[in-house]
């Protein structure tokens, strides 16, 4: 990645960073419970090094980020208020929260910043221009963001989870200000470059999640490159159904059955499916679990996890791997009775890593599972903060938020 980094900005001999406005696009899109409490602060923690370095250097730091998918306007449910409190705690310094995105409160607070201050703008997606398909509308929002940091300001892209989006605070802003990759984005891209260019073999890929359609492009791409591709999670049932197996009430995408059959016909020696399944009569944390063979799922039950024999087989595949990429849980890990498959496969990846494998957890639910199941995060070589961005990179797609940094 031929881009300028945070180090270049901090060590620019021509322009002192102290006193300058710096807009940082962070990824602070953390999960909240029904009471609005943060359940996994991983992305907030990952954003700290860049913000800390800038504040320590005396920059006037303005952070922009989103939370959830508000529908085109302010919604208290998606306010960054709990994020600002958590960020203050993790950063060890007060983080102001603006009452709007680029309105009068944001402007007044930006003008009042002193060296080393940190201001978090309210949810950028409260402004519909952020996600507009209209280039002109997005540019107008980007221009309003420039006004907050000033003409001598800079932009630091540090939200890896959004670099696959062509949005005002990710893409358009970088066309208007001197731009740099933050610590997190630079590290993420370096890892993915390593994963795509110099892969040590055997190369094992573990894919989970609920829908085949969400992962189709990455399955097609990685099946050509990997030595083994393990499929679990809800999407394994569409693959099983494509082989004429009855999967009961399990999640199936009927429109993807032919595609799954073709994938198995083409890459049958690479793709590995579960051989046993943990089923239950309903999707519930206290549903009674039962382990059955993958081709013996009762009509009145649904699969909610892979079984112990599948974990054993997948562990054997992973034990000799030199490179591992994992994206997506093996089952409904949020329910303790259906978490063993995800935990078992994760432990197998940790075991391979301990023997020298290079392992990458591709963000999203997999990263949440690692933390929720109490697994050692340092047991993996890298845990990404961006699920969708990681997948699109591995598919070979151009990521707009990275592409623009290279210009």
From Swiss-Prot:
HAMAP family: Phosphoglyc_kinase. This is Phosphoglycerate kinase. It comes from Mycobacterium sp. (strain KMS). Monomer. SUPFAM superfamilies: Phosphoglycerate kinase. Belongs to the phosphoglycerate kinase family. It is found in: Cytoplasm. Pathway: Carbohydrate degradation; glycolysis; pyruvate from D-glyceraldehyde 3-phosphate: step 2/5. Substrate binds at residues 27-29, 43, 66-69, 125, 165. ATP binds at residues 215, 303, 334, 363-366. It catalyses: (2R)-3-phosphoglycerate + ATP = (2R)-3-phospho-glyceroyl phosphate + ADP. Its main location: cytoplasm. InterPro entries: Phosphoglycerate_kinase, Phosphoglycerate_kinase_CS, Phosphoglycerate_kinase_N, Phosphoglycerate_kinase_sf. Its EC number is 2.7.2.3. One of its GO terms (cellular component) is cytosol. GO terms for biological process: gluconeogenesis; glycolytic process. Gene3D superfamilies: Phosphoglycerate kinase, N-terminal domain (3.40.50.1260). The gene is pgk. One of its GO terms (molecular function) is phosphoglycerate kinase activity. Keywords: ATP-binding, Cytoplasm, Glycolysis, Kinase, Nucleotide-binding, Transferase.
